[in-house]
């Protein structure tokens, strides 16, 4: 009897296990069940304790089946509950994408492989980052090498590798170039001396020079002597005309600039008057000798007393005119020397600020000096100098620019020195001298013995000189 009972229990256990296994297999291969189970998170959490225990053992189906068999041997109801939990846990395993794989070991390998692959990917990304860092460092080294080799000279120019030496060479060379370039242009002017044949062209050049002097004074020197914020300060002074020391101070500064311009005019007038008094009736009629040589011979050969008196009067008048023009030439050279001195200060300070700034300043000063030097050349020719001698005297004024450049390069604060010179009495005083030379000494020469067509050319030349200075003032 008990043997039959044991056999019956064994058959019941086998049937229960087979039913559970069949249920497991069916549920695992049923897509609808899997989909329902994946979305039913609440039911899974109800068996969370048991399910997590199965997750801890690696999610192996055989381990779960063994546990189900042991539970079935204890009680039928618990076996059913566990089977249901097992099925749910298996559904959880299906979330990993391995619901159809009954080999949990292979799943672990795949999971490990995935992890290793992710790690390898991260490592690859890290390597890529390292490569990017290396690429950036390489670019930095190339840029540094390019900057370092920008001023690398070899051979005869190797001395320019020293920054201080290079600064001096650039500054002095730029100053010499500015002084020599106008002389190169003067070589092509078809005037050799002050003769009657070259008179019309010389007057046109004098008109051009006077326009350059006036434009330089009113459009360059005087504006540079006035502070940059002058317009704003002026309106502010008018707005507070009853109140303040600030407006009074600005008005005093305006008066000082105009006062120095007047001082320059009066100083040049005084010097010319003193030279005339000291030299008296003496005159160096070098130019007169060229233009009136025939009249001299005629005076010596003629025995008529009236003719001698007329010729002597004409000669004295010409000598006085030449004497006046000579004094004007000297005064113009003095003013040009002072002007070139301030240009030299600006060139030195600009090269200290940088090579590019220095080159731009050099070009600006060069364009500014060309019409100015042509006018000086015409005044020197008019005063009796030959073309060669006038060009050599023009080079003497370059000493002013050289001295200004040297002082600027030696100064501890070249920018402050250049700004101080620009805002001091030097520029307005020089402007007054240029105004005096143009209006008192040069323009009166244009009023004598000119035809209508010659007058048109002279006025056009005068306006051209002013317009060139205007263009330079705009783009400076």
Swiss-Prot record:
One of its GO terms (cellular component) is membrane. It is a multi-pass membrane protein. Residues 78-98, 106-119, 127-141, 292-319 have a biased composition (Basic and acidic residues). GO terms for molecular function: zinc ion transmembrane transporter activity. Its main location: membrane. Residues 71-146, 229-250, 281-319 are annotated as: Disordered. It comes from the Eukaryota. It is found in: Membrane. The chain crosses the membrane at residues 2-22, 171-191, 204-224, 255-275, 347-367, 390-410, 424-444, 455-475. Glycans are attached at residues 194, 340, 449. Belongs to the ZIP transporter (TC 2.A.5) family. KE4/Catsup subfamily. This is Zinc transporter zipt-7.2. The lineage of its organism: Eukaryota, Metazoa, Ecdysozoa, Nematoda, Chromadorea. The gene is zipt-7.2.
